[in-house]
Amino acid sequence: MWLKYADVEMKNKFINHARNVWDRAVTLLPRIDQLWYKYIHMEEMLGNVAGARQIYERWMSWEPDQQAWLSYIKFELRYNEIERARGIFERFVKCQPKVGSWIRFAKFEMKNGEISRARNCYERAVDLLADDEEAEQLFVAFAEFEEKCKESERARCIYKFALDHIPKGRAEDLYRKFVAFEKQYGDREGIEDAIVGKRRFQYEEEVRKNPLNYDSWFDYIRLEESVGSKARIREVYERAIANVPPAAEKRYWQRYIYLW
């Protein structure tokens, strides 16, 4: 009803009347995004950029969803208002402090040639979201950013920090990217370490899914023995023998005894 009412006023070129209708509509129904979009579109078509900006500001005070914020940013970029867009991004990541929000902010800075600002976005995001469920996506984006900047050592440090920090069950893509990275930039030792890390990840997944899969525990132990870290070998043995099979399961006991 509000849309039709405003449309009638606009068709009859009663602009101030249409403005009044839109103003009443967004005041009464501030969560209906379509009303805001239509109101802003009218002002922009009339060349009233300052008025459109004021409407966006009113809308943002309601802390709307991601698309509304991105629409505001695109609006400012249409008029080449880079600093204004940057300021909106700062508010956006505070309102919606998600991995995707920060990655968009960093890519915006990168697109504008602001490498140090982009790096700062990633660093701030890691400080805030290193334990987030989507942290893998953040670390991969950060490492790939450093690769593009020809900073392979920075990228390697990010990958290694992430692999130590993120639970293995949430790091599959990270391992795959790290192995590919080492094949491109690493020496032989680095490549071997990455491959061992990937195999370690696979065994961790197998024993997590089935702790009584003693064949996987043996394979895992052999991997650590090939690496030669006594502490890791001991740790895997201790974890393996902690998984005592049910008393009646003879087939498990035969394999379990060999661990000792």
Predicted regions and their residues:
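Alpha-helical solenoid scaffolds in eukaryotic macromolecular assemblies
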Residues: 1-260
